[in-house]
A protein has these predicted regions:
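Conserved functional hotspots at enzyme active or ligand-binding sites that engage polyanionic ligands
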Residues: 1-115
Length: 115
């Protein structure tokens, strides 16, 4: 299996989940660096066709018009660490650097202090 790289979209089953976590078989965007991913885990953001709550809160990046076959919203407010091999993930495609840079910028606002 290929080592996932930042900017890859993989199809993976996110179950089991709890509460408001995205669930089920869905595309995810890999946001962690390949050197980290070689350790067996990846940080991903789920992609959804819904996600209105994330969009209105400013934590979603659209794939519409990006040139990718995968469409929907990257939910930057739900980063998650997963083992893609254990979850039998499958590589789908790679997004443009513009898309993954926009996702990383949204993630940065979550983890940086405003003060």
């Amino acid at each position: 299996m290929k080592t996932p790289a930042r900017g890859d979209i993989w199809l993976v089953n996110l179950n089991p989940t709890l509460g408001k976590e995205q669930q089920g078989l869905r595309p995810v965007l890999v946001v962690s660096e390949q050197a980290f991913n070689r350790l067996g885990l990846c940080v991903v953001c789920p992609i959804t066709q819904g996600g209105q709550e994330s969009r209105f809160a400013g934590f979603a990046v659209t794939l519409m018009g990006s040139g990718s076959e995968t469409q929907g919203l990257v939910m930057c407010n739900q980063p998650r660490t997963v083992d893609l091999m254990a979850r039998t993930g499958r590589f789908v495609e790679k997004v443009t650097s513009h898309v993954h840079n926009e996702v990383l910028a949204k993630l940065q606002t979550i983890f940086e202090s405003g003060s």
